[in-house]
C-alpha cells in the first residue's frame, strides 16, 4: 500500500494494483480531461496523473469528458450543461446561510448536539453536498470517493473553496481520499472515526421524480453503488458511534437488517446503525 499527497488536501490511496479497475464502474463512454485555455498544463497533468485520466486536445462528438471553464471543472457532454461540484455559491451558499444549522435532519442524524462535533467519514462522497454541510457545522469530514470523475470534481471544488474567504475555514475541515471506501475503511482501526455516513446511488427505478439531466448524466458516468451492503458492514466495524445511511423517505432498507433508529424528513430518511465488533483476523 502506498499513499501520495497532492495539493488541496487530496490523499490518494489505492491498493498495490493501482491499474486495476475500481468496483464502481463507469457505465457510459467517458473520454478524459479536455485541455482548455482555462487550465494550466501543470494542473492538467496533476489531475490526469492523480486520477488516471487521459488528456484530450479537442472535445469528442459524443460521450462525456471533464473540462475547465472560467476556472471551474465540470463534467460535459453535447446533450446537457456541465455538472460541477461547488461549495462557494449557488445551493451551497444558500444552505450554508439558511439551512437550519444544528436542527437540520442530517445534523441530528450524525449526532450533533451542543458542543459535540463528531468526526465523520463520508464514504460515498459524490459531489460532497452533505459533507460540506457537516463541515460547515464544525465537523471534520473525510470524503472518500472511488470514482475518478467525482473525485476530480471534488478536488477542484475544494481548491476553490479554500481560496474563498467565506468558505476557507470550512474547506480546511474537509479531506478528500481517492479510494474504494470499503477497502479504505477496512484498514482503519476500530472506533477511529465517530460516524460513517453513506448515501449510495442506485439504479433509477422510475418511481421517483425525474432528476435533472445533469444529475442523470453524473450517475450514468459515475455508476451505481451495487456493493453498498458490503460497505455498510465494514462501516459498522469501524465506526465508534454510529453509521448513518441516507435513503429516500419511502425507500427500502439498504440491507435486510432493521436499523437501530431513524430520522425521517419530508423527502429523505436517515437509517441509524449501531457499531459492530471488528471482524476477526
From Swiss-Prot:
Family matches, as InterPro entries: 16SrRNA_methylTrfase_J, SAM-dependent_MTases_sf
Gene that encodes the chain: rsmJ
Descriptive protein name: Ribosomal RNA small subunit methyltransferase J
Annotated S-adenosyl-L-methionine binding sites: 129-130, 145-146, 199
Membership in a protein family: Belongs to the methyltransferase superfamily. RsmJ family.
EC number(s) on file: 2.1.1.242
High-level lineage: Bacteria, Pseudomonadati, Pseudomonadota, Betaproteobacteria, Neisseriales
Cellular component GO terms held in the UniProt record: cytoplasm
Single GO molecular function: rRNA (guanine-N2-)-methyltransferase activity
Subcellular location per the Swiss-Prot or TrEMBL entry: Cytoplasm
Entry function: Specifically methylates the guanosine in position 1516 of 16S rRNA.
Enzyme class: transferase
The entry's keywords: Cytoplasm, Methyltransferase, rRNA processing, S-adenosyl-L-methionine, Transferase
The reaction(s) this protein catalyses: guanosine(1516) in 16S rRNA + S-adenosyl-L-methionine = N(2)-methylguanosine(1516) in 16S rRNA + S-adenosyl-L-homocysteine + H(+)
